[in-house]
Amino acid sequence: MDLSDIRREYIHGGLRRKDLQANPIDQFNLWLQQAIDANLSDPTAMTVATVDEHGQPFQRIVLLKNVDDVGFVFYTNLGSRKAQHIAHNNKISLHFPWHPLERQVHITGVAEKLTAMENMKYFMSRPKESQIAAIASHQSSRISARGVLEGKYLELKQKFANGEIPVPSFWGGYRIRPESLEFWQGGEHRLHDRFLYSRQDDNWTVDRLAP
């Protein structure tokens, strides 16, 4: 398979320093809203990268569930591989690929667990089917067949048919406190625009990077 000729030109225009927000969270929210307004598929989907105790990196796609001045939030099974990695090394990176807009955002930061109240508030807002699925699946554990998972789901669906589903102790969220955010905009002739926000105490510095 020859992939050498698969390429395209970037046509959506550049990114200039004068167009940037002073706060990178504001810049992120601006781009995220534009991705939503453009009807991109899964605009909140992000790659989460972690590292195990041997230094082996792993990536997976999860959905961003909140962003504010403190950080970026996602939820997962606390027994999952990513949660085990975070327990060992809470440095993490996130990546948002908004290909149709010729944009991407790369974030580095530190993960911290959400409070029980934050977990409960979000869990109770989920559809009941999603709540059941969170309990039925012990994420990253080995199972013999899909039928085992489906059987557990149906069992729990019947069990909680007429009542509230308690928040499982092995489920919760993380907030990523950002230390850097890089905004990438595709440019003509591969002269892409890259701006890196780096946290300095309570302030942010902004540097242009070569493509």
Curated annotation (Swiss-Prot):
GO biological process terms, semicolon-separated: pyridoxine biosynthetic process
Reactions catalysed, as given in the entry: pyridoxamine 5'-phosphate + O2 + H2O = pyridoxal 5'-phosphate + H2O2 + NH4(+); pyridoxine 5'-phosphate + O2 = pyridoxal 5'-phosphate + H2O2
UniProt EC number: 1.4.3.5
Pathway annotation from the record: Cofactor metabolism; pyridoxal 5'-phosphate salvage; pyridoxal 5'-phosphate from pyridoxamine 5'-phosphate: step 1/1; Cofactor metabolism; pyridoxal 5'-phosphate salvage; pyridoxal 5'-phosphate from pyridoxine 5'-phosphate: step 1/1
Root EC class: oxidoreductase
Pfam families attached to this UniProt entry: PNP_phzG_C, PNPOx_N
Statement: the UniProt record of this protein carries the keyword Oxidoreductase: yes
Cofactor note: Binds 1 FMN per subunit.
Residues binding substrate: 7-10, 65, 122, 126, 130, 190-192
A GO MF term: FMN binding
Cofactors required: FMN
Positions annotated to bind FMN: 60-65, 75-76, 81-82, 104, 139-140, 184, 194
Residue stretches in coiled coil: none
UniProt similarity note: Belongs to the pyridoxamine 5'-phosphate oxidase family.
HAMAP family to which the protein is assigned, alphabetical: PdxH
Task of the protein: Catalyzes the oxidation of either pyridoxine 5'-phosphate (PNP) or pyridoxamine 5'-phosphate (PMP) into pyridoxal 5'-phosphate (PLP).
Assembly behavior: Homodimer.
Protein name: Pyridoxine/pyridoxamine 5'-phosphate oxidase
Gene label: pdxH
